[in-house]
Swiss-Prot record:
Transmembrane segments: none annotated. Pfam families: WD40. One of its GO terms (biological process) is iron-sulfur cluster assembly. Residues 107-116 have a biased composition (Acidic residues). It comes from Cryptococcus neoformans var. neoformans serotype D (strain JEC21 / ATCC MYA-565). HAMAP family: ciao1 (MF_03037). Keywords: Repeat, WD repeat. Essential component of the cytosolic iron-sulfur (Fe/S) protein assembly machinery. Required for the maturation of extramitochondrial Fe/S proteins. This is Probable cytosolic iron-sulfur protein assembly protein 1. WD repeats lie at residues 12-51, 71-110, 148-187, 193-233, 278-317, 326-379, 401-440. GO terms for cellular component: cytosolic [4Fe-4S] assembly targeting complex.
């Protein structure tokens, strides 16, 4: 039996917190806010056995490491780490994208010797002689500001190999930038296919395929066509009716408390204005499965949709397979973790297990879903129907940020596999919270 255990609240932002993101290689958690700052929290993970922890196991210890006072003029809406963990991108409502790196301030002597240096900084990790940094204090500095969007930047993200950076905006555009040496970025594509505000982007975990979600109710899938340039190869539009979320009476009490509404909650939910299926709904968020065969989306009606890739070619089509009722209001954030060793057989994973999907949104709930499918077919093009895929809630927390919306959830997914089952959330109350999935 699993549950969601709170590890506490971290020093909060002064205004709503919008995005949280774990560094993939270092013990750092980043958050951003309307207050225009980026906060970096360091943490120590106690040694533990493989698999998910129990509720009595030692907890990770977090501390505020740095408050970055950005030069952004408005809300910092989105942040994303590069795969090597050395670079952090920030997208702001001032229409710009900031690129941040940890650097060492040059001494006065070094400034005179290196007048050609960019600003008064050099990358952390090397000194002027090419040796180690010698314990010198490091600072996070904006090494590049990318301009081009005409309105609020809503989301940023690096491709899986770190070679590309993408951004999207209220101006209906999606930009792709090529990462070059010395903090240089070249715009290689501007896609203007959406008819409304583009809310989020998500890179495929292994390939250069970019998904974007919009207020226009569409999900666009783009890739670099070898015969031309970056282009949209499919436009996905939700169509399946939702399957009601059923919580058996035999479910753990904490799951029933979180997901089965009381009479008062039912009355309040009935008064909410949720768009019916026949009306277009905003697609707020996207998340790829770790194997790249599935794409999850969340929207205004509170449901979660799963889309299956029907082939192995870069431009293979995706098909909507499932739409399950999940939240009572808009789903603002999704995050998909790799499969974890099961409690029953630590150290092994079920080949049909797609991992855990975390969802959060306007109703203040965090829900953890387990998703399983039949074993991988011999043919990558073999499709799965909605009766074969299983999505079920295994842990949940209501009022995770009090009465406030939850704007972001993110799993701790590291190369060294430390921090399994740990995730963070950011809310309108400005707080950043940390949770973990534990075994009772």
């Amino acid at each position: 039996m699993l549950r969601l255990q709170s590890l506490g609240s971290l020093p909060a932002h002064a205004e709503p917190a919008w995005t949280v993101s774990f560094n993939p290689t270092r013990s750092l958690l980043a958050s951003c806010s309307t207050d225009r700052t980026i906060r970096l929290y360091s943490y120590i993970i106690p040694s533990s056995s493989d698999g998910l922890p129990s509720q009595d196991d030692s907890q990770a210890v977090f501390s505020l490491a740095k408050v970055i006072e950005t030069d952004h003029k408005r809300t910092v809406r989105s942040i994303a780490w590069s795969p090597d963990g050395r670079t952090l991108a920030s997208g702001s409502f001032d229409s710009t994208v900031g690129v941040w790196e940890e650097v060492i301030p040059l001494s006065d002597d070094e400034e005179e010797e290196d007048e050609g240096a960019q600003g008064v900084y050099k990358p952390a990790g090397v000194d002027s002689d090419g040796d180690g940094d010698g314990g010198k204090e490091k600072e996070w500095e904006c090494v590049t500001t990318l301009e081009g969007h005409e309105s609020e930047c809503k989301s940023v993200g690096f491709s899986s190999d770190g070679a590309l950076l993408a951004s999207c905006s209220r101006d209906k555009s999606v930009w792709v930038w090529e990462v070059q040496p010395d903090a240089d970025f070249e715009c290689i594509a501007v896609m203007m296919e959406h008819s409304q505000d583009v809310k989020s982007i998500a890179w495929h975990p292994h390939e250069e395929i970019l998904a974007s979600a919009s207020y226009d109710s569409y999900i666009h899938l783009a890739y670099d066509d070898p015969d031309s340039d970056w282009c949209i190869f499919q436009k996905l539009h939700p169509s399946l009716p939702s399957t009601p979320l059923t919580i058996p009476s035999t479910s753990p009490s904490h799951l029933i408390d979180a997901l089965v509404p009381t009479e008062e909650e039912k009355k309040a939910e009935a008064e909410l204005q949720v768009p019916p299926l026949e009306e277009d709904e905003t697609v707020w968020c996207l998340a790829w499965s770790p194997d790249g065969r599935w794409l999850a989306s969340g929207g205004d009606n509170g449901g979660i949709r799963l889309w299956q890739r029907t082939g192995s070619q870069p431009d293979s089509a995706f098909k909507e397979i499932l739409h399950t009722a999940a939240h009572s209001r808009s789903v603002f954030s999704l995050s998909w973790s790799p499969p974890y060793p099961s409690a029953e057989s630590a150290g092994s994973t079920d080949s049909t297990d797609l991992g855990m999907l975390a969802s959060a949104g306007e109703d203040g709930k965090i829900i953890i879903w387990q998703i399983t499918v039949p074993p991988s077919p011999s043919s990558a093009s073999q499709e799965i129907d909605n009766e074969q895929i299983s999505i079920r809630p295994i842990a949940a927390q209501k009022d995770a940020h009090g009465v406030n919306d939850i704007n972001s959830v993110a799993w701790c997914v590291r190369e060294d596999k430390k921090g399994w089952g740990m995730l963070s959330s950011a809310g309108d109350d400005g707080s950043v919270k940390v949770w973990r999935v534990v075994r009772d």
